[in-house]
Amino acid sequence: TAYEIVSRDWSSDVCSSDLEDATQPTKHDFGKDIIPSLIHKVPVYAYRFYDENKKASKYWRDVGTLDAYFEANMDLCGVTPEFNLYDPEWPLRTYQPQAPPAKFVFAEQGRRCGQALDSVISPGCIVSGSTINGSVLCPNVRVHSFCEIDQSILMPGVRVGRHARIRRAIIDRDVLVPRGAVIGYYSDEDRRRHTVTDGGVVVVTANDEPYIAPIDERALAAELA
């Protein structure tokens, strides 16, 4: 994303004139409309986003669409992502939640094994006998047993019930994914129940009702054994 730094007095004048011009056919976007119109009127400066030591541009990604946001997060799960969260030369200045470390429980033979592969798991998360693959779990997410989470983003406070399967999805904050829910596997059901991006990413909000798969009696018996 992009940031513009302006003085309060200057921004008041600019915003006022932009509001007066609101009937004009523009999106009133800082980068596309407002700044270009000001270049010949007032001093405008750009920060050269370049690493002189490495002789390369620093990381920048436009996340103005859901697909772009999704791909930027998926890139973090790679072995050598373009944006390295662990680079001591570029620390993140952000709020750190007061939460315990992530925890993975159950190591039984078969499906009930709490594990995460090629994923970013935030503090406060508990993965209870489920597999997380290529996904980003935000703080305080709880995934109950026998779930499969693949290439997905789970926002803070999400709860996932047992036997749920989620693939290529963004689950909104504090959503309770019900037991047996299937998200990202059946395109017709996904489009009928959720928002689906042009890139095929399923976006699930608190008001959605995910498709529930029929209960596998053998799996249920094994769970209760």
Where are these regions (language model features)?
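Single conserved hydrophobic/aromatic residue that forms the stacking wall/gate
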Residues: T1-C15
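Left-handed beta-helix
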Residues: E20-A225
